[in-house]
């Protein structure tokens, strides 16, 4: 909330999502000195070698620098498009969630076309949070924060899912505790699935087909899905 340049990056990513017809899901990770501190931020900041805020990351493959909105949104779209072209999706996600008291329950069906070792991460996000934000050096007490990470329902490193055969369906259930100060009507669950790069067309350990490669580990995001709490998302492959 203290970061004056963060709204500009956020707007650029919203634009990128719109350009991709909603196939790009967003999550806003706040640091320890924000009003919306999230416990998992440091884990991902370390993985992606974040030196300062704001920093954008797309598909766990490449970081995006903050710039003019049109430049930044184009960079995000380019990386996401490159992921889809270079690494065709091999998983599909169907999910549902319910809130019982302060317990969030998430049921997941993971459709897997290709045997591999995957990692599944489940986060609880909140939209429409009105509060303070430094907006380009101007104090804005009515700024609307969206896609704010509230709870890591799994480890931030993801739950390991071993799939030994092609064309399998893996069923998983997760749960976590929700704070009473969070608005259930504005909550949604974000699920993303990471897959190892493998040895596809690599030269000296780097995929020769791609431009945007940050060497942030052995996996990239193969697919993701966001659904409002209390709703069901049917299988979607994209």
Describe the residue ranges of each PLM region.
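Short active-site neighborhood of thiol/selenol oxidoreductases, capturing the structured segment around
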Residues: 1-4, 191
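Typically the conserved alpha-helix immediately C-terminal to a functionally engaged Cys/Sec
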Residues: 4-21
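Short, conserved sequence motifs used for protein processing/export or organelle targeting and
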Residues: 15, 22-237
């Amino acid at each position: 909330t203290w970061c004056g340049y963060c709204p500009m990056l956020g707007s650029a990513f919203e634009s990128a999502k719109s350009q991709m017809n909603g196939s790009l899901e967003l999550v806003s990770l706040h640091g320890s000195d924000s009003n919306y501190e999230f416990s998992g931020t440091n884990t991902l900041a370390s993985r992606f070698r974040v030196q300062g805020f704001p920093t954008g990351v797309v598909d766990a493959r490449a970081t995006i620098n903050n710039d003019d909105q049109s430049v930044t949104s184009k960079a995000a779209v380019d990386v996401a498009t490159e992921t889809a072209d270079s690494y065709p999706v091999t998983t599909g996600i169907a999910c549902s969630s319910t809130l019982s008291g302060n317990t969030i329950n998430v049921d997941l069906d993971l459709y897997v076309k290709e045997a591999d070792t995957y990692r599944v991460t489940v986060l609880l996000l909140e939209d429409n949070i009105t509060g303070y934000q430094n907006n380009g050096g101007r104090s804005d007490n009515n700024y609307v924060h969206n896609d704010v990470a509230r709870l890591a329902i799994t480890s931030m490193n993801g739950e390991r899912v071993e799939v030994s055969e092609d064309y399998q369906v893996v069923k998983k259930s997760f749960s976590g505790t929700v704070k009473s100060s969070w608005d259930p009507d504005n909550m949604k669950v974000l699920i993303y699935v990471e897959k190892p790069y493998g040895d596809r067309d690599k030269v000296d350990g780097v995929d020769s087909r791609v431009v945007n490669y940050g060497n942030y580990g052995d996996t990239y995001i193969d697919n993701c899905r966001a659904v409002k709490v209390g709703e069901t998302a049917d299988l979607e492959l994209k």
